[in-house]
UniProtKB/Swiss-Prot annotation:
GO terms for molecular function: structural constituent of ribosome. It comes from Meyerozyma guilliermondii (strain ATCC 6260 / CBS 566 / DSM 6381 / JCM 1539 / NBRC 10279 / NRRL Y-324). Keywords: Antibiotic resistance, Cycloheximide resistance, Ribonucleoprotein, Ribosomal protein. Pfam families: Ribosomal_L44 (PF00935). It comes from the Eukaryota. InterPro entries: Ribosomal_eL44, Ribosomal_LSU_eL42, Ribosomal_zn-bd. GO terms for biological process: response to antibiotic; response to cycloheximide; translation. This is Large ribosomal subunit protein eL42. One of its GO terms (cellular component) is ribonucleoprotein complex. The keyword Ribonucleoprotein applies. Belongs to the eukaryotic ribosomal protein eL42 family. Confers resistance to cycloheximide, an inhibitor of polypeptide elongation.
Length: 106
């Protein structure tokens, strides 16, 4: 279980700052894939009509987890940076701190 606080004081690369400032932490989420990207247009054109599946469908998935990517936004200049963490099964943002002698809860 990885628990990350919602704010973090870290270095800001923005032109205004270039020093340690408070950052707001959120988890990165991939955007919706565009229908008009060149690869998608080519794929849709190839798929249309008769002939079934034209490209291989990937089945041999090897990984069970994804790396967690944090999005850090500077409170002062609003510059955004990304920071990747190690792989983990359980990720929590701004959860309660651990107490000594407590049982683990998921």
């Amino acid at each position: 279980m990885v628990n990350v606080p919602k704010t973090r004081r870290t270095y800001c690369k923005g032109k205004d700052c270039r020093k340690h400032t408070q950052h707001k932490v959120t988890q990165y989420k991939a955007g919706k894939a565009s229908l008009f990207a060149q690869g998608k247009r080519r794929y849709d054109r190839k798929q249309s009509g008769f002939g079934g599946q034209t490209k291989p469908v990937f089945h041999k998935k090897a990984k069970t987890t994804k790396k967690v990517v944090l999005r850090l936004e500077c409170v002062v200049c609003k510059t955004k940076a990304q920071l990747s963490l190690k792989r983990c099964k359980h990720f929590e943002l701004g959860g309660d701190k651990k107490q000594k002698g407590q049982a683990l809860q998921f």
